[in-house]
Regions:
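Residues at the N-termini of beta-strands
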Residues: 41, 99-102, 130, 154
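Glycine/small-residue-rich loop that forms an oxyanion/phosphate-binding "nest" at active or ligand-binding sites
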Residues: 77-116, 120-121
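N-terminal binding-site loop/beta-alpha segment at the start of enzyme catalytic domains
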Residues: 1-68, 185, 277-279
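Short, acidic/polar
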Residues: 22-34, 80-94, 114, 139-141, ...
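Beta/alpha (TIM)-barrel catalytic core signal, keyed to glycine-rich beta->alpha loops juxtaposed to Asp/Glu
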Residues: 107-279
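Alpha-helical scaffolding within the catalytic cores
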Residues: 1-4, 52-59, 88-90, 138-141, ...
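Acidic (Asp/Glu)-rich catalytic clusters
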Residues: 7, 55-65, 89-96, 121-123, ...
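Acidic-and-aromatic substrate-binding clefts and catalytic sites of carbohydrate-active enzymes
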Residues: 22-25, 44-53, 77-82, 108-113, ...
Length: 279
């Protein structure tokens, strides 16, 4: 398993298992399967309502806690210093762990400065091994990173072959912040799994379109967390380090970039209004 080094020296797997939209009742089974396949990083969030299942699976796996990298996120209803501080303790309890390896702020809305101060404090106390943000576009990210004491280790943003975030990644690199992809398979949108270019490149390596797309991101030094509730698909998503895309193949995939989200634009006022309704 390839590891990446965060800006505070902490190492984390480049490939992990995501549990977005995994039902709480299914989370334990899915994470147990993922750990059995070989995954050693699990990405959850307060808003997913499945932290308990993740914690149970890790605890009952028999794998030392130090060998499983847990990522979670604070939801905007818990932003502000005091609420974020309490929510970190709540996540620790639900995950049945004394520390969380990486804790992120889930969205760039509400009092994220107050919430980030709570992250910094919990980091210094040893409750969090690393801290970061999620869905922060370059304007939000640069503003925050320039005005906090601990620069985010990671920014988790929509990143896949149709929304490649190359410019955003350059800005984050200037701060030593790594890009982490949510939706690395774009939830199958825009004909993802039947894309002729991805299929053709996959045939060169006896790999699927999904495996090619995931490998493309890892070769660009992006952290990925593909999600599947099917163990066979978990295994396919895991087996992406036994081949290398050529520079020519990388360029062909780069040309697939649409330069826009397939989900929502965090700079769109209507998107902000939507999230305000989820507080």
């Amino acid at each position: 398993m390839k590891e990446v080094t965060l800006n505070n020296g902490v190492k984390m797997p480049q490939l992990g298992y995501g549990v977005y939209q995994v039902e709480p009742a299914e989370a334990k089974r899915c994470v147990s399967d993922a750990l059995a396949v070989g995954y050693r990083m699990v990405d959850t969030a307060q808003a997913y309502a499945n932290e308990e299942g993740v914690g149970q699976a890790v605890k009952e796996s028999g794998i030392p806690r130090s060998e499983v990298f847990i990522v979670s996120k604070i939801w905007i209803s818990n932003f502000g210093y005091e609420r974020a501080k309490q929510s970190i303790d709540d996540s620790l309890r639900r995950l049945q762990t004394e520390y969380i390896d990486l804790m992120l702020l889930h969205q760039p809305f509400c009092d994220y400065y107050g919430a980030y101060r709570a992250l910094e404090e919990a980091y210094r106390e040893g409750k969090l091994r690393a801290i970061g943000v999620s869905n922060f576009q370059p304007n939000h990210f640069i503003d925050l990173a320039s005005n906090v004491e601990i620069v985010p280790a990671v920014n988790q943003v929509e990143t896949h072959v149709f929304c490649q975030q190359r410019r955003a990644q350059q800005y984050m690199n200037e701060f030593g912040t790594l890009t982490m992809s949510w939706g690395p398979l774009a939830e199958g949108r825009n004909g993802f799994f039947t894309n002729a270019e991805l299929i053709a490149i996959g045939q060169n390596h006896n790999k699927s379109a999904a495996q090619v797309a995931l490998r493309y991101l890892t070769q660009r030094d992006v952290i990925i967390i593909p999600k599947s509730v099917n163990r066979d698909r978990m295994e396919q998503n895991f087996n992406i380090y036994d081949f290398e895309l050529t520079p020519e193949e990388m360029a062909r995939i780069e040309a697939l970039d649409l330069g826009k989200s397939l989900f929502f634009d965090h700079n769109d006022p209507e998107t902000v209004k939507m999230f305000m309704g989820w507080r």
